């Protein structure tokens, strides 16, 4: 077989066509960055009994990320944000997110501002090294009143702005009730 321009073009076209129909996994690719963690709510009884021992066991199992499910009185599981971050760091754990419920009581409608309690919640999340503040629940009265829910959606957006000031994002942990049509024929997501 002699090399000719015609053979070169034909073979190049065949090679290009072969690459297009080849399975995508035959080429080397970077390893996927799967950030699998554990929501500490799933081990809440253990965290309540002994948070340090529980975190140590989770780290030994191989978890690298945790999501808190208990924050009260400016503490995560009884520890200040700085103390809790130090504990996590000691076990090689990170806490990119956590559940802290934004409730009606956290918004002062007269002042059009958050209460100090919610401001501290966001500040403490940043101190603990979080990237996301997740509200885990909606007040019952919001789940049955369409106008109240629409109005509170604005508060959610303002919480996003507050979190953004600390380099974080705000989110909501949904459930099945957000898809029901109990808000004057509307769902929460409408």
Regions found by a protein language model. Give the residues of each.
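N-terminal secretory signal peptides and thylakoid transit peptides that target proteins
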Residues: 1-16
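Active-site acidic/histidine proton-transfer and metal-coordination neighborhood
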Residues: 13-14, 20, 107-190
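Hydrophobic alpha-helical segments of integral membrane proteins
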Residues: 20-22, 41, 96
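C-terminal segment of N-terminal export signals and the immediately downstream linker at the start
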Residues: 24-53, 57
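Acidic (Asp/Glu)-rich catalytic clusters
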Residues: 31, 55-60, 77-97, 117-129, ...
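Hydrophobic faces of well-ordered beta-strands that scaffold small-molecule active sites
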Residues: 34-39, 66-68, 95-100, 133-135, ...
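Active-site mouth loops of central-metabolism enzymes
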Residues: 37-49, 101-115, 145
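Active-site beta-loop-alpha junctions enriched in small/polar residues
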Residues: 41-43, 69-73, 100-103, 138-140, ...
């Amino acid at each position: 077989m002699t090399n000719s321009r015609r053979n070169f073009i034909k073979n190049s076209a065949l090679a290009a066509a072969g690459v297009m129909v080849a399975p995508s996994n035959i080429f080397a690719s970077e390893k996927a960055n799967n950030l699998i963690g554990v929501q500490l709510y799933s081990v809440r009884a253990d965290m309540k009994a002994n948070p340090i021992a529980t975190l140590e066991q989770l780290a030994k199992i191989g978890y690298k990320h945790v999501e808190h499910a208990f924050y009260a009185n400016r503490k995560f599981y009884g520890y200040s944000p700085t103390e809790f971050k130090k504990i996590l760091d000691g076990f090689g754990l990170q806490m990119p997110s956590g559940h802290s419920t934004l409730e009606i009581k956290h918004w002062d409608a007269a002042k059009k501002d958050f209460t100090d309690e919610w401001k501290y919640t966001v500040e403490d999340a940043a101190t603990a090294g979080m990237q996301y503040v997740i509200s885990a629940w909606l007040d019952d009265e919001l789940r049955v009143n369409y106008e109240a829910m629409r109005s509170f959606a604005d508060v959610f957006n303002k919480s996003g702005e507050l979190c953004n000031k600390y380099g974080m994002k705000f989110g909501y942990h949904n459930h099945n009730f957000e898809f029901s049509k109990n808000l004057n024929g509307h769902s929460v997501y409408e």
